[in-house]
Amino acid sequence: MKTWALGLTLTTTLILSACGGPRAFTRGEYGDPNEISMLDDKWNQNDMQLVAKKMIGSMEGWIDGRAVEKPVVILEVPRNRTSEHIDMQALYDHVKTALIQSGKFTFLDKTARQEIAEEYEYQGSGYVREDEAQGPGNQRGARYMMGGVITSTVQQVGSQKVVYYKATFEWTDIATTEIVWTDQKEITTHFKKQSIGF
């Protein structure tokens, strides 16, 4: 009798533990990255795509309206002035990739300069064939610097919440420090807190 009662107790404990313990995401499926999906009130992939699309179109329109050679651009350090984590590098990469693929822009990799300088030293050390060795003096010089910043405000009253983002991009002429192009994208999202019942 005691053995049966002990077995029942253990079985009940295991069942309750399985029901009440933490649950893991064990099944998933691929979705369309262009579909809008808002799971919470944070910056998400859809917001990034809206900003990128606006900036890409605006920059291409600016270049098309000017009789200038293919501009050479470097990127500023991205600035996130919101209270949440936003992957600004992912946003920059999204914009940069589309502009390069358009064939209208040339981007220089400022982040690789130190590694390239070290590679120059190695290739000039005698280990590399002279006719293939690369060295300083042939790098392109950027004419423009592209920068971006995202700010946000949050308003909450009762169960209602409004989140507002403003993304601003600009191009600065390195020779003159003149801001030659700028544009903004504003995003407002509304949320309502749902009560959780049992």
Spans of model-derived segments:
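Sec-dependent bacterial lipoprotein signal peptides
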Residues: M1-C19
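Residue-level detector of alpha-helix boundaries and kinks
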Residues: W4, D40-N44, N80
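C-terminal/domain-edge helix-coil "capping" segments
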Residues: C19-K70, P136-R143, V154-F198
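N-terminal segment of the mature soluble domain
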Residues: L50-K54, S58-V128, T176-T182
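A short, acidic, amphipathic alpha-helical segment used as a generic capping/interface helix at domain edges
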Residues: V128-P136
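Generic short beta-strand segments
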Residues: V149-T153
